[in-house]
Amino acid sequence: MASNGGGGLRHSNSSRLSRMSYSGEDGRSQAPGGGGDRPMVTFARRTHSGRYVSYSRDDLDSELGNSGDMSPESGQEFLNYHVTIPATPDNQPMDPAISARVEEQYVSNSLFTGGFNSVTRAHLMDKVIESEASHPQMAGAKGSSCAINGCDAKVMSDERGDDILPCECDFKICADCFADAVKNGGACPGCKDPYKATELDDVVGARPTLSLPPPPGGLPASRMERRLSIMRSQKAMTRSQTGDWDHNRWLFETKGTYGYGNAIWPKENEVDNGGGGGGGGGLGGGDGQPAEFTSKPWRPLTRKLKIPAGVLSPYRLLILIRMAVLGLFLAWRIKHKNEDAMWLWGMSVVCELWFGLSWLLDQLPKLCPVNRATDLAVLKDKFETPTPSNPNGRSDLPGLDIFVSTADPEKEPPLVTANTILSILAADYPVEKLSCYVSDDGGALLTFEAMAEAASFANMWVPFCRKHDIEPRNPESYFNLKRDPYKNKVRSDFVKDRRRVKREYDEFKVRINSLPDSIRRRSDAYHAREEIKAMKRQREAALDDVVEAVKIPKATWMADGTHWPGTWIQPSAEHARGDHAGIIQVMLKPPSDDPLYGTSSEEGRPLDFTEVDIRLPMLVYVSREKRPGYDHNKKAGAMNALVRSSAVMSNGPFILNLDCDHYVYNSQAFREGMCFMMDRGGDRIGYVQFPQRFEGIDPSDRYANHNTVFFDVNMRALDGIMGPVYVGTGCLFRRIALYGFDPPRSKEHSGCCSCCFPQRRKVKTSTVASEERQALRMADFDDEEMNMSQFPKKFGNSNFLINSIPIAEFQGRPLADHPGVKNGRPPGALTVPRDLLDASTVAEAISVISCWYEDKTEWGQRVGWIYGSVTEDVVTGYRMHNRGWKSVYCVTKRDAFRGTAPINLTDRLHQVLRWATGSVEIFFSRNNALLASRKMKFLQRIAYLNVGIYPFTSIFLIVYCFLPALSLFSGQFIVRTLNVTFLTYLLVITLTMCMLAVLEIKWSGISLEEWWRNEQFWLIGGTSAHLAAVLQGLLKVIAGIEISFTLTSKSGGDEADDEFADLYIVKWTSLMIPPIVIMMVNLIAIAVGFSRTIYSEIPQWSKLLGGVFFSFWVLAHLYPFAKGLMGRRGRTPTIVFVWSGLLAITISLLWVAINPPSQNSQIGGSFTFP
């Protein structure tokens, strides 16, 4: 088979797959999928330094001895020359099944690189890490080499990693040499005895029979045909398998009961329908299914638990009462002016009007809170129980791709990321349906080797978790549990196993911590060797001439002695953070379809895993290409690169993204989220958001890091409308919702009461039928049927990616096991094995993560994560809700995920600053909720409007925090007198606020302390970070000044002496100035007010009490901030004293200048000292 202008000939020898490249005629990486051709594999040569270099045009010319009389045209003609070798008895193609298996073995051991103006290379990794890789799925796993002289290929291995040797003498031979030996007489090259089995498939063993019928004509199905075959209807599959159905085998394997089709068993619906019986016809049988399966009562996967009316009704009533009281109070304030201090009255009224609007925007979306519950037993019964459509009981759950993002190993410790990866690999979800993608946006070798170490340690950790039901499955968190680890453990070998795994984990931590030094020493050694070689070559070339010092860029070297294609420790051209090639490494290749049980400890393994499935999910390292001149779009761009590469490699219909410091705390969390997606009506759910829970927070939660009011009050309330907002991590997405498609059966909402009081549906039958037939729809198209020809303009020109879209849509549908399930799929459709990885697939994945792929497409505009905001998560969720998708809030009994949060005051303020800046950007962009479509409900629109408007409250909040001080300084108050009407309004507003807080605590489950901490930090953040966010947002909108933020540093868990050491570190930032000024001004004002009242001729105690009360209210909210300034030992930083002194002097001078003291010598009236 000849290549399409790839500059080389394709070879059948599997050992040559390690030297392959995917290139076009111009040497540039081709646009993927062009013309529907699969990427071709061509040769590359290996240099003396171990690097693989493709055969460019110059290389080919030099290889052929290009002379001066050879024209460029002749060189180009040679490049496009094709040779097709016909099949002969000595040149027979390898069996497709065996060839695919051989190729997958090499693909999983190869590091793929490529991108802009470069070919896609696959570099065989003989060694990925310094330590030995033992698991057969892992890249660089130990394998034997072929014993034939001159052959560098690896011996075929089985699923356990053991060598497959065709002769009893155990002579090691690869697949190609074995085929040559059979052709040349069939004798073993080692012992010279004839082979007993001369067919390679007899040696390797045939693969399990697929559950789908073979392709017509007996021809092997192509990759796309196999992937599309699952979309056949269940009726067609049942008819095609009628003759091959073995009832006895099914009864034996599923432990069923004899009855269906039995002479004693009555025929189903024989009277009514004339069908039924053993053939399964009629309604009772349900398309050939036994009635004992279809007669089961249908059970939902999820339930909506409404808030008790005894709590919700008073809560709604109080909201209405407080709304009315606020309106009356504001009207009274406007009518009754303070003529003595109009400036004070005017500022207070404006602030109170804004606070009333802000409270209304925050409170209205809380009218419809709900709770939800899942039933995992029903999920297992529907998707993993043997049925006629799934006789072997294979998992019928859809595939799930997990995205883990990291960018800087210095601020995000590799050990934290590795523990997150281990918790994902050990999750309780079908191994063959789970894939994990790690996005390293920094392209660091440290992250790469840390992930390889994690994959190696997973060989022991994951089976250990499955064997003993370990929770949590993050080793760092598990071994640091404060509770008894042996509680409820009944296996006699648990103590021995735990001790062994703990020792292995300690060694694993040491290896991770030593990686930076190991990489540095290795790079120094290889760099010294290269310098010596360069100097030697220079001396040989210069002879007696003066030799200048050789300067070679100091590269970063991998464990196998080759250059790292990503970012070097000392950045160089094409090896810097913003300039490096795309990299993909399959750390753990896709597992086999059937369970693979381990061996006993006597057979050489450290632990006894004889009854444990030792397979591991697929793990892929991805670092997208970055080049100068291309906008990388930060985290959103990295996520979109993962969406495209995962669509090509595994195409899971669902995606779950996690930050590198958020690990899986509940091993069944994936199943909990899948319950919502697979339930009736689940095809309209765009994403399932899990709450964020944090570890390492100080017991008092000084800075409201747990954020329970938002996650347990606001998010539960939004779940009763259209669903919660997307908060950036711990979210399960439907892939086609990320692709920008509309949900099925979407409708428009016109009224403001449709959220809590839905109107009767009036939908035309023809419209429903049309939407059921139309699986994929986009808002940009008015045609009834989707115009597939427009897909390349939206998604790019990758045919692999475009062809995967309808497959992902079909696989993401719920089961059609109930008449109420719309747009469902037949049971058993997802029990087919996944395709093996081949070189063209990974080469295509390299192409879709290149820097130029998104040019002239809608990625980041309407497709995938949305660009243009530092809070891309909120914007992405808003776009889905705006298209009509719903979201669900999944609160599990055991926390689904846990992560870390910055407990340092400065880090916390910068985190809030980033969130608030993103909200300001949203308000001034096209994503403003005022411009939302009619597919978004009214209260959902109010919630998103509040997201964009809340930072502006800081302007009025700061003014209002100074009003008590101004009142005390001036001797005036916001009202003329503290009369009964004002005090009554104030009392009612305060009481209703407290009662609402109590009821929120009642239905949300938070504590009063958490509610109060949230109130305190609302004022701290509102007077510091929110104000800075408004200023930065206005600068970006008006002046076009871009805003850059640094990553929040994650704790590596090394502070064993003090877990909360960061809490007491005082790091100065300009964000602290406004709260410090507010505190100092109010303290000085209280002192001035007391002194004036005491020494005045006519003391006005009512105004003093009013001003002092509000000043103390402000200071009470700022108490955590003041405590944070004192550090560990209660020492206030010197800069605070300096600011306080300057502030006191400034205020005193200003006050003397504005209001000079009177000439009355009798200060203080009749009061005299004794």
From Swiss-Prot:
Entry EC no(s): 2.4.1.-
Name of the protein in its database record: Cellulose synthase-like protein D2
Transmembrane segments annotated in the record for this chain: 311-331, 341-361, 955-975, 981-1001, 1027-1047, 1070-1090, 1104-1124, 1134-1154
Task of the protein: Thought to be a Golgi-localized beta-glycan synthase that polymerize the backbones of noncellulosic polysaccharides (hemicelluloses) of plant cell wall.
GO molecular-function term, one example from the UniProt record: cellulose synthase (UDP-forming) activity
Alphabetized UniProt keyword annotations: Cell wall biogenesis/degradation, Coiled coil, Glycosyltransferase, Golgi apparatus, Membrane, Transferase, Transmembrane, Transmembrane helix
Annotated region described as Disordered, given as residue ranges: 1-75, 269-295
Keyword Hydrolase: no
Record-level GO cellular component terms: Golgi membrane
Membership in a protein family: Belongs to the glycosyltransferase 2 family. Plant cellulose synthase-like D subfamily.
Organism, scientific name: Oryza sativa subsp. indica (Rice)
Location of this chain's protein in the cell: Golgi apparatus membrane
Alphabetized SUPFAM superfamilies for the sequence: Nucleotide-diphospho-sugar transferases (SSF53448), RING/U-box (SSF57850)
Record GO biological process: cell wall organization; cellulose biosynthetic process; plant-type cell wall organization or biogenesis
Residue ranges of coiled coil: 527-551
Positions annotated as active site in the UniProt record: 441, 873
Top-tier EC class: transferase
Bilayer disposition of the protein: Multi-pass membrane protein
Bias-annotated ranges (Low complexity): 10-24
Biased composition (Gly residues): 273-288
InterPro entries, per the entry: Cellulose_synth (IPR005150), Nucleotide-diphossugar_trans (IPR029044), Znf_RING/FYVE/PHD (IPR013083)
